[in-house]
Amino acid sequence: GYICHKTGTGHNDFSKPVAVYLEPATDRVRWQKPVAVLTNRRSYSSTNDFVNKMKQLPKAVVIGDKTGGGSGLPFTSELPIGWSVRFSASPMFDPDMNHIEFGVNPDIKVDMNSEDIQKGVDTIIETAREYLRNHKE
């Protein structure tokens, strides 16, 4: 993905997008099987960034609902009246330059329904279990 950094006091004073790269560790054993990442609207902030990175991995699938967003390296400041304000200071993007501040879409969208909740069934977990059973690679 990409990240921009604040460069001035103006509303749109940000750097050009800078690519962010992650490389796997080469000095230890790595998990080589499929992974299901479960999300919903309560997955936000650092989780949003984690989900965005996991979506780029060939053996990872994101299952559930769109994340709640809110990455972007939050900045906190105090206003002259004593109130604190917190906001994203560094817009973040996926590899296709889609802004992720407002959430990351799942690969497989699953909604929890009231009937399953009443029965104690977690539709997202059950979908992930089924996916992993069928993708044992």
Annotate each PLM feature.
Residues 1-34, 72-76, 89-93, 99-100:
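Gly/Ser/Thr-rich loop/hinge elements
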Residues 32-34, 58-61, 135:
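Loop/turn elements at helix/coil->beta-strand transitions in domains of secreted/extracellular proteins
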Residues 44, 57-70:
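Short, well-structured beta-strand/strand-turn elements
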